[in-house]
Amino acid sequence: GFYFRSIQGFYFKRIQGNICSEPKKVGRCRESFPRFYFDSETGKCTPFIYGGCGGNGNNFETLHACRAICRA
């Protein structure tokens, strides 16, 4: 019911905040995947090249996904 949705929303907001505040991390492999990360200094989703492994949660395949999760 309502209580579960409230708890679920709380955890989603905590996860969302943590992901969006993580720094850009290209990873340690040498692939070249175009991705987007949320730049907390500018408040915008910015393109970068992801190496394919490692990295963190602030790594989105599309601009739309970055904006939707980080509310940019």
UniProtKB/Swiss-Prot annotation:
Segments forming domain BPTI/Kunitz inhibitor: 20-70
GO molecular function annotation: ion channel regulator activity; serine-type endopeptidase inhibitor activity; toxin activity
Gene Ontology CC: one annotated term: nematocyst
Site label Reactive bond for trypsin, positions: R30, E31
Misc note: Negative results: does not show activity on all potassium channel tested (Kv1.1/KCNA1, Kv1.2/KCNA2, Kv1.3/KCNA3, Kv1.4/KCNA4, Kv1.5/KCNA5, Kv1.6/KCNA8, Shaker IR, and Kv11.1/KCNH2/ERG1). Does not exert any effects on TRPV1 channels.
The name this protein goes by in its record: PI-stichotoxin-Hcr2j
Family (UniProt): Belongs to the venom Kunitz-type family. Sea anemone type 2 potassium channel toxin subfamily.
Temperature dependence: Thermostable. Optimum temperature is 25 degrees Celsius. The ability to inhibit trypsin slowly decreases as the temperature increases to 7% inhibition at 100 degrees Celsius.
Leader sequence segment: 1-9
Keyword Transmembrane: no
A Pfam family matched in the record: Kunitz_BPTI
Gene symbol of the encoding locus: iq4c7
Record has Disulfide bond as a keyword: yes
Residue ranges the record assigns to the propeptide: 10-17
Species name: Radianthus crispa (Leathery sea anemone)
InterPro entries, alphabetized: Kunitz_BPTI, Kunitz_BPTI_sf, Prtase_inh_Kunz-CS, TFPI/VKTCI-like
Site (Important for the stabilization when complexed with trypsin): E61
Keywords of this entry: Cleavage on pair of basic residues, Disulfide bond, Ion channel impairing toxin, Nematocyst, Protease inhibitor, Secreted, Serine protease inhibitor, Signal, Toxin
General function of this protein: Serine protease inhibitor that acts on trypsin (Ki=190 nM) and to elastase. Does not bind to alpha-chymotrypsin, cathepsin G, and kallikrein. It significantly increases neuroblastoma cell viability in an in vitro neurotoxicity model, being a consequence of an effective decrease of reactive oxygen species (ROS) level in the cells. It also protects cells by inhibiting ATP-induced purinoceptor activation. Its binding affinity to P2RX7 is moderate (Kd=45.5 uM).
PROSITE patterns membership: BPTI_KUNITZ_1, BPTI_KUNITZ_2
Subcellular location as annotated: Secreted; Nematocyst
